Amino acid sequence: LWIASYNNGVTLYNYSTQQSVVTYKTDSEVLPLPSNTIRTILKDRENNLWVGTAEGLVVLNGKERFTSSPIFRKFSFATHQNNLLFQDNIVHIREAKNGDIWVGTLDNGLYYLKRNPSTNDWNYQWINVQKGLSNNCIKAISEDNNSFIWVATNKGLNRIDPQTLSVKIYQLNDGLANNEFSERAYIE
């Protein structure tokens, strides 16, 4: 069981022994995190652990997690104004049914990560207000039965077509009770 904390990093807990196996924090010698404030975690279909912190996104390689030297990978591709995703305040990580990853930030919009099957690298698209999103403060990410991605923000609900990355915004005039959503407050 992976346990995320608000100020104490992320801990792997063993049910059988009822003890913590390892805790990763900013001061860890082997695998320091960019921040001890963990906002969200996701275990994907390949057993990788995605850790969204207040200062960036890291991924713990699931295949090598229990060896003597686990591997954290920082995402560091360039975005706008020389900022990097690994410095963003990550608030939600979502794996789509097809294995793509959607990463929501507190004030920098949304990142769509798609694995390139030939290189195994992650390609990304940055979706923000300039690309049609209602607001850059992401509150929640969900996927419907038609594979549309629904993104709740501070200023409305957005439906994204993952094929074209086109965005349709829903707000008060579309029947919403409020334009501002709570963080990760949804049921599927």
Labelled PLM ranges:
Residues 1-188:
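Carboxylate-rich, polar loop motifs that coordinate divalent cations or form catalytic acidic clusters
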